[in-house]
């Protein structure tokens, strides 16, 4: 049986329009009452009126805002659909939306602010480092929390202590899962036996995918001919790419986010490194950052492939006046579905929103439930990670298309 983690232990281990709310950014000393919020106060606020307060947070500004906007839009779309269909047992969902600007400290401030405003459950955060910080804070409140897209294993589970973060779930697959899947695909499906890796050091997402790709590829019998890294803020990768070129790989695994991937692909072409590149879900949004030729024969894994759910895609376009931007929007939608699944169980049990029993009922329902999501039907394993297939995508004329489910 897995241990359930406390806030203290987690801290040690981890080191867009609201339906009835407003969008704000959270400053550490902006004059809000967030820093003095109490669990008792939040319970009273959550239980007031005929609404259920749900927090939705992400980086709506900053260098990863393309992900945050997509997640928040996807989640908000589903919550508004629930409200339009009568809410949950007649209660409307009040959406508390916060911009954490891609910063872990801001993310905790946003979380605490929403607790003070009476949040009953949280959809968020989006990227790994802020999510780790919020998950640590959320444990003290046993706040039901579903991240759409944070992939680090430690968000839900500490492997060193074999401890599950009891109140936290995710709709996406993990860093280890992605690294292992792409190694399997490279070796078993594409037939590559020699691979190199280039990744950003000191970044949870990048290092997590890289480590698991290397371990899995070698366990299958493949050879990692080179591992190159770079630092936050670097924009010139030619030295690393030239070194990789000299090691004669058949493919390069590049588990980085789309803006850096675009630069790396361009510079790889300039130094004569033309072997196929592989990546993780951070590649989602890459189109426009690399040429069609640079994207040819590349592959990456994702939770969702365009065209998989026309009903969702049409609804997103109708709501926001544009096509969904990347696979993070469907994940936001499914994270919201997961939260509502839990809220429905708590409401059906006649519990009072915001109370300890209510929050535990939400958590228990999610842990044992089956979610009919648009990224697939999924359950949760003992680590609170979804059990589902992954989509392998490639690029055709510069656009990502589904190659196969794997």
Protein language model regions, located:
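Extracytosolic ligand-binding ectodomains
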Residues: 2-11, 27-406
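C-terminal motif of bacterial Sec signal peptides marking the signal peptidase cleavage site
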Residues: 22-25
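Hydrophobic helical h-region of N-terminal Sec-dependent signal peptides
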Residues: 15-19
């Amino acid at each position: 049986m897995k241990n359930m983690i406390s806030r203290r232990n987690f801290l040690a281990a981890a080191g867009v329009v609201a339906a009835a709310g407003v969008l704000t950014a959270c400053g550490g000393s902006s004059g809000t009452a967030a820093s003095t919020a109490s669990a008792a106060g939040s319970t009273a606020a959550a239980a007031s009126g005929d609404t259920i307060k749900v927090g939705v947070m992400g980086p709506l500004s900053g260098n990863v805002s393309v992900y945050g906007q997509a997640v928040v839009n996807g989640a908000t779309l589903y919550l508004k659909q629930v409200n339009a269909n009568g809410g949950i047992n007649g209660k409307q969902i009040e959406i508390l939306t916060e911009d954490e600007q891609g910063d872990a400290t801001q993310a905790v401030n946003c979380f605490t602010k929403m607790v003070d405003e009476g949040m009953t459950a949280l959809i968020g955060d989006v990227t790994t480092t802020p999510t780790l910080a919020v998950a640590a804070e959320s444990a003290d409140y046993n706040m039901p929390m579903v991240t759409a897209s944070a992939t680090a294993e430690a968000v839900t589970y500490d492997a060193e202590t074999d401890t599950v973060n009891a109140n936290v779930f995710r709709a996406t697959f993990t860093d280890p899962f992605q690294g292992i899947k792409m190694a399997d695909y490279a070796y078993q499906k594409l037939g590559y036996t020699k691979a190199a890796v280039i990744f950003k050091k000191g970044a949870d997402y990048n290092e997590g995918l890289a480590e698991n790709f290397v371990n899995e590829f070698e366990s299958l019998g493949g050879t990692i001919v080179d591992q190159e890294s770079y630092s936050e803020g670097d924009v010139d990768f030619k030295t690393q790419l030239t070194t990789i070129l000299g090691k004669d790989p058949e493919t390069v695994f590049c588990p980085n986010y789309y803006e850096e991937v675009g630069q790396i692909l361009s510079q790889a072409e300039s130094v004569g490194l033309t072997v196929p590149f592989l990546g993780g879900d951070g590649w989602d949004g890459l189109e426009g950052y690399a040429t069609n030729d640079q994207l040819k024969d590349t592959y990456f894994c994702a939770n969702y492939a365009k065209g998989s759910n026309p009903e969702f895609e049409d609804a997103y376009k109708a709501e926001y006046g544009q096509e969904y931007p990347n696979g993070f929007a469907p994940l936001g939608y499914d994270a919201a579905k997961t939260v509502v699944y839990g809220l429905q169980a708590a409401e059906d049990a006649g519990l009072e929103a915001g109370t300890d029993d209510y929050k535990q009922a939400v958590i228990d329902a999610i842990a044992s439930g089956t979610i009919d999501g648009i990224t697939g039907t999924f359950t949760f394993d003992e680590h609170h990670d979804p059990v589902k297939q992954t989509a392998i995508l490639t690029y055709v004329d510069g656009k990502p298309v589904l190659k196969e489910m794997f």
